[in-house]
């Protein structure tokens, strides 16, 4: 755990890092895999908390969050802070991690099927 002025932030452990590494090895961008892994464990977090816990830079977190938002994998909620200024955004996964893994699995199966179809076409042309 990392303790900040606001609260404590869970950091990724070895199992979490392995999980993110496997997602990355399957073709997911590293920073996206890390943010998904973190949110699956933390439930919800601000970009600042994600950065502290994952050691990703703020720009890396922003790009990963944008990519996940574009894929409809995360939601964002505005949370007003006690002081002045704009509200903070808190992110969470829209689906349980098992559903995200299933979606990723289906995508890989579809890609494999397309590759096998191309190979069969090649064989037919020989």
Model-derived regions: residue spans:
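N-terminal leader segment of winged-helix/HTH proteins
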Residues: 1-26, 82
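Key DNA-contact positions within bacterial/archaeal DNA-binding proteins
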Residues: 59-60
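Short, cationic-aromatic polyanion-contact patches
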Residues: 21-31, 46, 79-101
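A short acidic, leucine-rich amphipathic alpha-helix
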Residues: 49-53, 68
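Glycine-centered, phosphate/nucleic-acid-interacting loop/turn motifs that mediate DNA/RNA or nucleotide
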Residues: 72-73
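Amphipathic alpha-helical dimerization/coiled-coil segments
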Residues: 95-126
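Pre-recognition alpha-helix immediately N-terminal to the DNA-recognition helix
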Residues: 33-37
């Amino acid at each position: 755990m990392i303790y900040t002025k606001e609260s404590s932030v869970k950091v990724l452990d070895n199992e979490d890092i392995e999980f993110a590494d496997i997602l990355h090895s399957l073709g997911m961008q590293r920073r996206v895999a890390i943010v998904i892994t973190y949110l699956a464990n933390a439930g919800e977090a601000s970009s600042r908390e994600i950065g502290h816990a994952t050691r990703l830079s703020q720009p890396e977190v922003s790009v990963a969050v944008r990519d996940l938002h574009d894929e409809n994998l995360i939601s964002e909620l505005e949370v007003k802070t006690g002081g002045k200024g704009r509200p903070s955004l808190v992110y969470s996964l829209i689906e349980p991690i098992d559903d995200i893994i299933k979606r990723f699995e289906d995508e890989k199966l579809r890609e494999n099927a397309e590759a096998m179809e191309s190979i069969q076409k090649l064989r037919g042309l020989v």
